[in-house]
């Protein structure tokens, strides 16, 4: 039988060396031989098999040229160690492959979040790079617009390149500062002319009062003419008429003594009253005409 020949060859060659205690089941046995029950042997055959020994005599190494027994497993001259390793490899191949597959699946499951994180990191980096690119583009656009506006103001004296625009703008700003300083000085001069005096020149205040003047306007004109004849400049005049009394105050610039200015004003007022039509009355007039004047230094 095929099973007996297989076990006989295995016991003779391999089982005694690798499995001293028991003989393992062979993975190469057909399923039908294992599942189907063997027919019961005849009594004579059973007695003969009972007398047979479990061991066979060793007849020496089988030569390569000798024919193999019917149903025996031939080794083909292969080393026993290699055969055993091949058998064990075939027996453990399925389990090892399964363990390897599970390990690969676990590694792949662990790599999925890492890939996702790497993908998210790449997205963040790409978005940051995009925002940086947009900000840089906006900055360059603003800079170009500023150069264009500056060139519009200095186009007559500048070339189109940026260095010429900046240099021309700097020169133009310096010229504007010089012009501003000149205008400020001119403004101060005009203010001094409007005020009508030089701050270095002394100033005095002339005050006079006239009771019942014949003509207040004539009195004022006469006083101003007399001051003009003395090269005296009037800075300001303030006058008021209360009842029959004329009160006048003048601020004048003069280098003449204050007493001389006072005498000149009094003489001018007296001359106005003499020239009036009713000047037949003895001076200072029957109308009780009186005049007083006062000069005080302001500066």
Swiss-Prot record:
Quick check: keyword Electron transport in the entry? Answer: no
- Positions in coiled-coil regions: none
Induction comment: By abscisic acid (ABA), methyl jasmonate (MeJA), drought, cold, salt and wounding.
SUPFAM superfamilies assigned? HLH, helix-loop-helix DNA-binding domain
| Record's compositionally biased regions (Polar residues) | 288-299
* Remaining remarks: Plants over-expressing BHLH148 display drought tolerance.
Tell me the protein's name.
Transcription factor BHLH148
The gene name on file is BHLH148
């Amino acid at each position: 039988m095929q099973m007996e020949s297989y076990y006989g060859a295995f016991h003779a060659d391999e089982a005694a060396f690798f499995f001293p205690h028991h003989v393992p089941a062979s993975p190469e046995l057909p399923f039908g031989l294992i599942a189907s029950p063997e027919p019961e042997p005849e009594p004579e055959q059973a007695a003969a098999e009972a007398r047979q020994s479990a061991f066979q005599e060793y007849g020496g190494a089988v030569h390569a040229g000798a024919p193999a027994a019917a149903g025996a497993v031939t080794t083909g001259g292969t080393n026993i160690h290699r055969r055993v390793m091949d058998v064990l490899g075939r027996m453990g191949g399925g389990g090892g492959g399964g363990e390897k597959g599970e390990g690969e699946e676990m590694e792949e499951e662990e790599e999925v979040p890492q890939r996702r994180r790497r993908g998210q990191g790449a997205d963040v980096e790409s978005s940051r790079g995009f925002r940086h690119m947009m900000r840089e583009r906006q900055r360059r656009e603003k800079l170009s617009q500023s150069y264009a506006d500056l060139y519009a103001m200095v186009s007559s004296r500048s070339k189109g390149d940026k260095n010429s625009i900046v240099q021309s703008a700097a020169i133009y700003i310096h010229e504007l500062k010089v012009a501003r300083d000149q205008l400020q000085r001119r403004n101060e001069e005009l203010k001094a002319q409007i005020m009508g005096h030089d701050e270095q020149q002394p100033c005095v205040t002339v005050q006079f009062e006239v009771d019942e003047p014949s003509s207040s306007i004539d009195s004022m004109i006469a006083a101003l003419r007399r001051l003009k004849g003395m090269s005296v400049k009037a800075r300001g005049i303030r006058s008021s008429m209360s009842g029959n009394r004329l009160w006048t105050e003048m601020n004048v610039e003069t280098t003449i003594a204050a007493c001389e200015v006072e005498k000149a004003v009094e003489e001018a007022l007296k001359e106005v009253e003499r020239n009036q039509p009713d000047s037949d009355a003895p001076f200072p007039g029957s109308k009780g005409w009186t005049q007083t004047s006062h000069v005080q230094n302001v500066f």
